[in-house]
Curated annotation (Swiss-Prot):
The PX domain mediates interaction with membranes enriched in phosphatidylinositol 3-phosphate. Probable phosphoinositide-binding protein involved in protein sorting and membrane trafficking in endosomes. May play a role in cilium biogenesis through regulation of the transport and the localization of proteins to the cilium. Gene3D superfamilies: Phox-like domain. Residues 11-128 form the PX domain. It is a peripheral membrane protein. Keywords: Cilium biogenesis/degradation, Cytoplasm, Cytoskeleton, Endosome, Lipid-binding, Membrane, Protein transport, Transport. This is Sorting nexin-10A. It holds the Pfam family PX. It comes from the Eukaryota. Belongs to the sorting nexin family.
Amino acid sequence: MDNTSFEKREFISVWVRDPQVHKEDFWHTYISYEICLHTNSMCFRKKTSCVRRRYSEFVWLRHKLQDNALLIELPKLPPWNPFFNLNNEFHITQRMQGLQQFLEAVLQTPLLLSDSRLHLFLQSQLSIAKMDACAQGHTHYTVAQAIQRCGGEARFPVEEQHQEDSKTCCDSDCDSTTSSGLGCSIEPATLVEQDLSHNERFAHEFQATNPEAELCSSLSSSPHGHSVI
């Protein structure tokens, strides 16, 4: 088998989808996006993964990638919009598409695939501070351990297409304010809080039986920031 044949068979597929609203308090609300990765590339430790990230984390990633690859012109992110509206379907879809295009371009740049922060961003649940610390070797766990500990059931569009095709028109009868109307659900704050509570309970039980408490705590904590981005 020649190198050309091998390169044709290697692939890295990424999807940015399923925007969900997270309400931190009365004033602070943001949207997170699900990032699904499917690959057979030897560059990645896990061949399938799903994590959730917010816009500000994409900004951090681009900044770190640029610092480590000064001679490369990185793809641009969708611009920050001071008038971004959480209830505006067009704003959400436009940003989501821009984030996916950014990741697709990054993953097509071989030099960037060696950056450990990119792998932590795509395949771990660590916060920005924890990703930075882990990449610099300042944690008790390695990059590989952080990635392997990431749970998250992967859900890919190509695998769900059959289910989508089998749905009846009753889907349209179920539309409500919890849906963007574009196939990307906007999760109410109450459901998000339930998910977070579930994660906290899981982390507590895991810590009680696993000595790697620091890593588990990092994986179970979701990043928090300011305002609506």
